């Protein structure tokens, strides 16, 4: 087995482990969510809000916000400690993978960056996420979530007051209903958002810590290759970035979007990235199977049935993919702008009107 095949296999197996670790981290928010629920209910059952003046309401909201701030601060502190631990582990993992991937007869012990360098990397390198969270540092990314959720919860109380709702109705709006397993309340939104933030933060620190190890071994590591998940859930950004290579100090890194599952794999000087018989995992129309490692996402998607293509990238893009007469490479190029943000169909049509015409998509 070629050295880089060993790195690829280890990285993909580790990506699966990382998704499980993310799920475990997400569950750690549950007791804090319960505390938020208890605190709000306890405060809203002391007196009927319909008897409050606006000034008294604002004092109540300040009190509630202070309670929420304390809870979210404690959660953020715990999360940040966990993220540092994860980062240290990921740096060690990458060093071990590099060391084990050395060909027979080659003595190589990968260097591991110091704890201070790892911490600096995860805290001072911005997230590659595009959109509203683009360019944020880890702390402001997490702080933005907690501030938004505090405003959402206090805003629900304020709105309920001005709309003449009873305390019970406000609590119900915040908690949700038992009939829908409390999935229709504001706290359910907070919980979902917490999950997204945690998964994205874990991906960020894992990638940045691994990259720090690769930079520490730049005499062996030439570049990194983006590896996306081959299934119908992969986003347009990750579909297009799949198999793209970047220098160690250039290009985006996972997470490229919220809840990103992509990873990067080291390209070393030991051998070509993939042996000719190398494979990677996929979940296509026929279920889970191994496919040739050199296949990009869109190479793989071309081999799937039309119905699967429609599900994966949407019926309009899929029709353009099949009938627009574009090469797979050109179709992939059309998906993102120069900043790796997704292009709309309107923007794509402006760039390739003839392809849309061939596919019968101009109307």
Residue ranges of each PLM-predicted region?
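N-terminal leader/targeting and assembly helices and adjacent pre-domain segments
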Residues: 1-180, 273-363
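Acidic, glycine-rich two-metal-ion catalytic cores of nucleic acid-processing enzymes
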Residues: 171, 181-282
